[in-house]
Swiss-Prot record:
UniProt-annotated binding residues for Mg(2+) 2: 117, 273
Gene: purL
InterPro entries: PRibForGlyAmidine_synth_PurL, PurL_linker, PurM-like_C_dom, PurM-like_C_sf, PurM-like_N, PurM-like_N_sf
Organism (species): Sulfurovum sp. (strain NBC37-1)
Name of protein: Phosphoribosylformylglycinamidine synthase subunit PurL
Pathway: Purine metabolism; IMP biosynthesis via de novo pathway; 5-amino-1-(5-phospho-D-ribosyl)imidazole from N(2)-formyl-N(1)-(5-phospho-D-ribosyl)glycinamide: step 1/2
Family named by the database record: Belongs to the FGAMS family.
One cellular-component annotation, GO: cytoplasm
């Protein structure tokens, strides 16, 4: 065995291990002091990024079961039954820290990592989404300019990787707030399709079965990445570029095809991608799930650089790599497949019955430790929590505390925020139509949809989160993220089934941040129980903080739903002039956390808009059932900016004017953000039946106007349609490209 390390205190500090954790390590190793390889392994496996040691106690309460759930949390991705022997495999993950340091590679490898999570399960990826948060991009300050640079780099990275892989990026969300000036958020979602009896898991079992390495060679890129992502940033953080992985989408495409060919054989027991902590996490997770032991010979791992050490091989986060537990005697068959695809492949070890990880370097043992305490029994922290001091002041304010703004002036200002306007500059850099399963172009649906060629159905998916809501009410805001993502799916005509989440929060060592996180988890749990949409996969990203300033709580939710008829995917833009516009739901004059207060007065304050799960479910039922029988021509949820902004979006994208007169108590209520509302387009012949259906469900329904004309007129505010279109379609590009 290698010798124990010198300068122990400095080594522990560099590896983000506490003295208490070192005492645990000594206990696990029966009093033996670990060498540098073993310290590196403990550091990675017990990092926040890999162990979830601050968050696990709160995640355990999530609902994860339903008749349609095949695989819940704990595997590479979640799996749900979508009928006729088919399953959808999906997950959302973060690549926040790497993307802030190196936006192109950080975002690109985030896409690569989530794609591997999907095809590792045996599924072919068929759709990507992303949820992106940036700081303030408007203005001439260095921060504004750098944020614009980050936007350009992240979008380029996502597009470059996804396009090369031949996987369509069909939707997502982009928002901006100064709370992200020091930490942007890059959350990637991917979904794949697989036959429900052909799913592969990340396990290693069977004494004597070989352990095989496939994919790219191992280099030093990404060393310490998991530990870096488990710490907050300072002004010097850009020096961490060496911890950011470098992606090669062409190699990943070869790896995808090779793996899918491999899955057609019965030559393997399990397979795991090498993500955070690289070979370390893959090996420990595969063996930890089954109670097996492993022997691995690190000198047999394909190397990209000379002079690499066992420490480098175990902790490198080089991309496009997999670890396989094969059936003994089938090695050559596997080697032939990967060599055909011009990928590296090597037998590097075998499964044992020792329940220990034994690593060798040219015959010398460099690691010997029990697997379970490292992979399954990482220390769980019970961090202190405290309700944030800012909340009392924030929720005490109402819209009435501000000077009245002329409604026309407000309308023109609320049309132009980057979170409102069209994101064609973003999604036109993504290939959204490759594989020819995308039902409609991005921007024309509240949820992105793909057809399932095997059974005539369609899958709808939507990512959502309003960080302003989560700032003023961490529990309610998180619950509303689930509600709103489900509402978007329902607006497309699909029934929401399950979620994956990406929980982005600040420094867990701050009791106020930990309280926000705990409350957010409670909100997600409550909403998923009430809406019957279990959590099947997810990710936690903490330490999104720079110089003591944390991001807004941002629990991004991606909802997946099923439409039984791919020919009945409901658009969110107007279809025919002369049709009626029907508003479903109550407008209550609620402005807490609203775009109205943020854009006009620069603050995020107020009480969260009220919502009721039963009413929300009735709204979903109305839209889904009315769409089935052909009563609806389009549907859009009412959210940020109220009915005025929702109607303006529908008008701009469809290039059709509108004349609307909605019943409101106060003229500014056309901008309020009351929940459980939708705008439905209904032909004259179907209007009475639609109104009867709404009444039968106890939902308020009001015919508020007609489609047609050259103006967008909502109550007392109006603009020429061409002006609305110019603002909507050109603002984003003008802002982001102003430095070029």
């Amino acid at each position: 065995m290698s010798q124990p390390v010198e300068n122990l205190d400095e080594v522990l500090k560099n590896h983000k291990l506490s003295k208490e954790e070192y005492e645990d390590i000594l206990r696990i190793l029966d009093g033996r002091h670990p060498n540098i390889v073993e310290i590196g392994i403990f550091s990675a496996m017990w990092s926040e990024h890999c162990s979830y040691k601050s968050s696990k106690k709160y995640l355990n309460g999530f609902p994860t079961k339903a008749p349609w759930v095949i695989q819940g949390p704990g595997e590479n991705a979640g799996v749900i039954d979508i009928g006729d022997g088919m399953a959808a495999v999906f997950k959302m993950e973060s690549h926040n820290h790497p993307s802030f340091i190196e936006p192109f590679q950080g975002a690109a490898t985030g896409v690569g990592g989530i794609l591997r999570d999907i095809f590792t399960m045996g599924a072919r990826p068929v759709a990507n989404l992303n949820a992106l948060r940036f700081g303030r991009v408007r203005g001439d300050s260095d921060i504004n300019k750098y944020q614009r640079h980050l936007v350009r780099g992240v979008v380029d990275g996502i597009g470059s990787y996804g396009n090369c892989m031949g996987v369509p990026t069909i939707g997502g969300e982009v928002s901006f707030d100064e709370s992200y000036n020091g930490n942007i958020l890059v959350n990637a979602f991917s979904l794949g399709l697989v036959k429900s009896d052909e799913i592969f898991l990340g396990v290693a079992s069977g004494i004597g079965n070989p352990v095989m390495y496939v994919g790219s060679k191992t280099g030093r890129d990404g060393l310490g990445g998991a530990v870096m992502s488990s710490d907050s940033f300072t002004e010097e953080s850009k020096s961490l570029r060496p911890t950011v992985q470098v992606g090669d989408p062409f190699t990943e495409k070869l790896l995808l095809e090779a793996c899918l060919e491999l899955f057609k054989t019965d030559a393997i027991i399990g397979i795991q991608d090498m993500g955070a902590a690289g070979l370390t996490s893959s090996a420990f997770e595969m063996a930890g799930k089954t109670g097996a032991g492993l022997i691995m010979h690190l000198d047999k791992v394909p190397a990209r650089e000379e002079g690499m050490t066992p420490y480098d091989f175990m902790l490198s986060e080089s991309q496009e790599r997999m670890l396989i537990c094969a059936k003994k005697g089938r090695e050559q068959e596997i080697i032939d497949i990967f060599e055909k695809w011009e990928l590296d492949v090597a037998v590097i070890g075998e499964v044992t019955d020792t329940e220990r990880m034994e690593l060798f370097w040219y015959g010398d043992k460099v690691c010997d430790m029990p697997i379970a305490p490292v992979s399954e029994e990482a220390p769980i922290l019970d961090r202190p929590v405290a309700r944030p001091a800012y909340l009392n002041e924030v929720i005490a304010k109402t819209v009435d505390d501000y000077a009245k703004v002329d409604d026309q002036e407000a309308y023109e200002k609320l049309l132009a925020p980057l979170e409102v306007v069209d994101k064609a500059w973003v999604y036109n850099q993504y290939d959204s139509m490759v594989q020819t399963n995308t039902t409609k172009h991005p921007g024309s649906l509240d949820a992105s949809c793909i057809r399932i060629k095997e059974n005539g159905r369609a899958l709808a998916m939507s990512s959502d989160c309003n960080p302003r809501y989560c700032y003023i009410d961490p529990k309610g805001g998180a619950a509303l993220a689930v509600v709103e993502s489900g509402r978007n799916v329902a607006m497309s005509g699909a029934r929401p089934l399950s979620i994956t989440d990406c929980l982005n929060y600040g420094n867990p060592e701050n009791p106020e941040v930990m309280w926000q996180f705990a409350q957010g988890c409670e909100g997600i749990k409550e909403a998923c129980l009430e809406l019957n949409t279990p959590v099947v996969s997810g990710n936690v990203s903490l330490y999104n903080e720079t110089n003591g300033v944390s991001v807004f709580p941002t629990p991004a939710i991606a909802m997946v739903g099923l439409n039984d008829d791919q020919n009945k995917v409901l658009p969110s833009v107007f279809q025919h002039e002369g049709n009626n516009i029907v508003l479903i739901g109550e407008t209550k004059g609620e402005f807490g956390g609203s775009l109205y207060i943020k854009e006009l007065f620069g603050e995020t304050v107020g009480t969260l808009p009220s919502f009721d799960y039963k009413t929300e479910l009735k709204l979903w039922e109305l839209v889904i059932e009315a769409n089935k029988i052909g009563l609806l021509e389009s549907a859009k949820d009412v959210n940020v900016g109220g009915i005025a902004i929702a109607l303006s979006k529908m008008a701009a994208v469809s290039s059709k004017g509108i004349t609307v007169k909605a019943s409101v108590s106060n003229s500014r209520d056309i901008f309020d953000e009351s929940q459980s509302r939708a705008l439905l387009e209904v032909a004259d012949a179907d209007l009475e039946e639609l109104l009867d259906m709404a009444a039968g469900l106890g939902l308020k329904a009001e015919v508020i106007g007609k489609i047609g004309g050259e103006e967008v007129k909502v109550n007392d505010v109006a603009l020429p349609l061409e002006k609305v279109k110019d603002v909507y379609f050109n603002t984003f590009k003008r802002t982001i490209e102003q430095d070029l």
